[in-house]
């Protein structure tokens, strides 16, 4: 590696699986990029609701200390000999779930070339830091639905990390979107992002809102948050329609007879990043950054990510 790249870096690590308190800041070696990997000087890392699951041992593994952090953004400072898509100096965002060389809760991250994309020109690196995992999951949701122009679609959880991105992508696909968000602030966010109708799922009669929005029934529903209160609204997806949800949503949504229910996972690979970038570039796009943390704040961030918040939480390792 270049002499300008240090041998060690500051990172938030875990030495064992457990609660938020196992996260602590330490100095660890800067990872060496392999021949098909890039080394990223991290600007920001997303904090996802799945990160506490990883911290608790959900992905397994026995190598400690372990750096987690499933996605992030930054600048390429070194590239392996067989890397063709990136060069030193490129602004990138990347996905690092289950990456053997560690995640983005660090000053540097080495990731496979195919797990990264050029940061969209219209986004800041703060926004790009929270985009990869949620954006690639949202694109998978589009594929699960195959949304038709002017189709009435409901997004449940429209103010969350994946949901607020899904709302914007669905509008780009030409859908009419009913956004069910968390709280008055969530409904205001969804309205500001272009929802045709935004309601507060905590207080609104969601089924009544659906009947007014789509008298003949919904063509589809994307479920990023669920609960017994929302079940009547899901029954208003019409015959031939689709309910889609990312794996991990509980309780699993159910539809009526003739409605397809599909689960999906986030996409990966160069084509997925290119598709997401293409959708983002179609107009004004926003990754809502709710709060920004430092590395030593991550135990609290892991508590906060499981509570009410809008959009994304991020950590800036160099703050």
Give the role of each language-model region.
Residues 104-105, 181-189, 251, 272:
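Short, glycine/polar-rich helix-capping loops at beta-to-alpha or helix-loop-helix junctions
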Residues 85, 95-157:
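NAD(P)H dinucleotide-binding glycine-rich loop of Rossmann-like/cofactor-binding domains
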Residues 29-46, 56-98:
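Glycine-rich beta-strand-centered segment in the early N-terminal region that forms part
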Residues 129-203:
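Mid-domain Rossmann-like dinucleotide-binding core that forms the NAD(H)/NADP(H) cofactor-binding site
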Residues 188-262:
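Glycine-rich cofactor phosphate-binding loops and adjacent beta1-alpha1 units
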């Amino acid at each position: 590696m270049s002499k300008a790249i240090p041998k060690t870096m500051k990172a938030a690590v875990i030495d064992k699986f457990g609660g938020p308190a196992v996260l602590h800041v330490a100095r660890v070696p800067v990872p060496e990029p392999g021949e098909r990997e890039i080394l990223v000087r991290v600007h920001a890392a997303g904090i996802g609701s799945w990160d506490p699951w990883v911290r608790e041992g959900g992905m397994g593994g026995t190598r400690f200390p372990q750096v987690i952090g499933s996605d992030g953004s930054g600048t390429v400072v070194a590239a392996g000999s067989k890397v063709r898509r990136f060069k030193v100096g490129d602004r990138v965002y990347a996905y690092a779930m289950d990456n053997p060389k560690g995640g983005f809760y660090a000053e540097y991250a080495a990731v496979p070339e195919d797990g990264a994309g050029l940061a969209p020109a219209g986004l800041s690196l703060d926004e790009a830091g929270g985009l990869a995992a949620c954006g690639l999951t949202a694109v998978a949701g589009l594929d699960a639905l195959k949304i038709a122009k002017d189709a009435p679609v409901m997004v449940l959880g429209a103010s969350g990390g994946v949901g607020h991105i899904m709302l914007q992508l669905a509008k780009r696909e030409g859908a009419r979107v009913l956004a069910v968000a968390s709280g008055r602030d969530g409904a205001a966010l969804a309205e500001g992002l272009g929802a045709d109708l935004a309601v507060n799922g905590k207080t609104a009669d969601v089924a009544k809102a659906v009947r007014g929005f789509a008298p003949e029934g919904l063509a589809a529903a994307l479920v990023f948050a669920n609960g017994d209160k929302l079940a009547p609204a899901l029954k208003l997806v019409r015959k031939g329609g689709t309910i889609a949800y990312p794996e991990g949503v509980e309780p699993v949504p159910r539809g009526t007879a003739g409605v397809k229910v599909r689960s999906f996972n986030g996409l990966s690979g160069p084509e997925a990043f290119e598709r997401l970038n293409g959708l983002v570039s179609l107009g004004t796009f926003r990754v809502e950054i709710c709060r920004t943390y430092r590395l030593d704040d991550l135990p609290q961030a892991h508590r906060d990510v499981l509570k009410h918040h809008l959009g994304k939480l991020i950590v800036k390792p160099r703050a």
